[in-house]
Amino acid sequence: MSAVLKPTPTHDHHVADLSLADWGRKEIKIAETEMPGLMAIRQEFAASQPLKGARITGSLHMTIQTAVLVETLQALGAQVRWASCNIFSTQDHAAAALVAAGTPVFAYKGETLTDYWDYTHRIFDFGAKGTDGEGPNMILDDGGDATLLMHLGQKAEKDPSVISKPTSEEETCLFAAIKAKLAQDPTWYTRKSAQIIGVTEETTTGVHRLNEMSAKGTLLFRAINVNDSVTKSKFDNLYGCRESLVDSIKRATDVMIAGKVACVAGYGDVGKGSAQALRALSAQVWVTEIDPINALQAAMEGYKVVTMEYAADKADIFVSATGNKNVIRYEHMAAMKDEAIVCNIGHFDNEIDVASLEKLKWDEIKPQVDHVVFPDGKKITLLAKGRLVNLGCATGHPSFVMSSSFANQTIAQIELFTKSADYQVGKVYVLPKHLDEKVARLHLKKVGAMLTELTDEQAAYIGVSKSGPYKADTYRY
C-alpha cells in the first residue's frame, strides 16, 4: 500500500460539517446539567489551574459527553488535541461545536481506517496549524490506540520488520501510516514519546494492552488504569451498557425484544448490564462464559448458561461483551437463524469474526446496519460492522454515567501531571480509593441521595476515618 499520511491542511481540524456547531453546543449545554462530577471539578480547580502546561493528546469517542470532558480539561489549563477512538462513534455536531470553540478535533462518523490513523498521528502535533512542533506530555486514551501508535512506531524506527506483515485490514492501514511517517521523519515516534509523562486509559481492552507492556518491561511511560476505578467499571460498564445496548438495537432494527432469545457472550460488568437490559424488556437471556465464577453468577441470577455452539441456531439476538477475539465465529453465524441480529459491545471489532464474512454478499440496509447473505440465502443482520454497537448505532451511554467515568479521567490526568514523581515509569496504577470515593460523592446530590455519617465511636469500631476511605482496596463492590 502506498503512503497514506496526508499533507497538513491549512486548517487544524477535520470534521464533517462545521454548520452543525450550534446544534452541538446546545446539546453540550444540556449534557453539562447531567454531568455534575465534571462541573464540580471545574469549579474546584478553576483557580489553581492544575493542568496548566499540560498538552493532552486525546483518543476517545467524540461524543457530546466527551465534549464536556474536553472543555473541563481546558478549563483546568490544558491544551488539547482530539480524535475519536472508533471510526463509527463520532457525533458530528459535537465535533463541530468543539472546533467552533477553537479545539483541534479530527473526527467524523464513518471514517475510513486510513483517515483514522492519519488523525491519530495528527493529535500528537501541537505546533501551529498542525505542523510538527512540540508533542504532547499526556495521553488520554480509550482502547489504547494512541499508546499503541507511539510504541509500535518507536519499534519500527529500529526494526521495520515489525510492520512488514499485516494480518488484517486495520493493521494494513496502521502499518502504512507508520511507514509513511517514518519516510517523512525517521525519529518522529521517539521524539514524541520522550515528552510523554503518562497515559490514563479508559477501557478494559486498553488496560489489557498496558498490563502486557508493563509485564514485558516495554511500557514507555506511567499509566493510570481508569477502567478499574469502581466509579468507572461498576457504573459506566454496568449501568451505561444497561441503557445504551437496547437503545442501539432498537434504533438499528426496530425489533421487538420481548419474547426473543438473546445470547450475551461474557458476564463481566458489560455483560451483566447487557443481560439486565435484555431481560428487562422480557427477552429470554442466555449467557456464555469461560470463567466458572462468572458462569455461576449468571446462573444464580436466573440466566441459562450455555455455549455459543448450543445457542447459535436457537437465539435471535447475539451480543458479544468479552474483550476477547473470535468469540462469535463464522461457523456460529452460518448456523444462525435467518435475520438473527449480531452485535458487539466490546471495544474492538474482532470479537465477531467479521473478516470471515467479507467473502459473502453484503447488503447495506442503512448506515451501520447490514444484511450479510450466506450461500444458502440465509441472512444475518450485523450491526455497526461488528464495532461498538452502542456508539455505532446510537449515541453511547447517558451523560450522567459518563460524568462518573470522565471525572475519573480528569482526576487521573491531574494526578499524573502534578504528581509524576509518585508514579514509576513503566508501571500501571489505579486511582487511590479516596479519589474513587470522591467521584461518587460528586454525583450523590444529583440523584437525591443522602449519605449517612459515621459517629466517632462507629468509625473507631470498624477502624476507618470518618471521611474515608471506607473499604479496603481488596473489597469487591
Swiss-Prot record:
GO terms for molecular function: adenosylhomocysteinase activity. One of its GO terms (biological process) is L-homocysteine biosynthetic process. Pfam families: AdoHcyase (PF05221), AdoHcyase_NAD (PF00670). The keyword Iron does not apply. GO terms for cellular component: cytosol. Its EC number is 3.13.2.1. The keyword Lipoprotein does not apply. SUPFAM superfamilies: Formate/glycerate dehydrogenase catalytic domain-like, NAD(P)-binding Rossmann-fold domains. Keywords: Cytoplasm, Hydrolase, NAD, One-carbon metabolism. NAD(+) binds at residues 203-205, 237, 266-271, 289, 324, 345-347, 390. Its cofactor is NAD(+). Binds 1 NAD(+) per subunit. Substrate binds at residues 63, 142, 202, 232, 236. It is found in: Cytoplasm. InterPro entries: Adenosylhomocyst_ase-like_sf (IPR042172), Adenosylhomocysteinase-like (IPR000043), Ado_hCys_hydrolase_NAD-bd (IPR015878), NAD(P)-bd_dom_sf (IPR036291), S-Ado-L-homoCys_hydrolase_CS (IPR020082). Pathway: Amino-acid biosynthesis; L-homocysteine biosynthesis; L-homocysteine from S-adenosyl-L-homocysteine: step 1/1. Gene3D superfamilies: Adenosylhomocysteinase-like (3.40.50.1480), NAD(P)-binding Rossmann-like Domain (3.40.50.720). May play a key role in the regulation of the intracellular concentration of adenosylhomocysteine. This is Adenosylhomocysteinase.
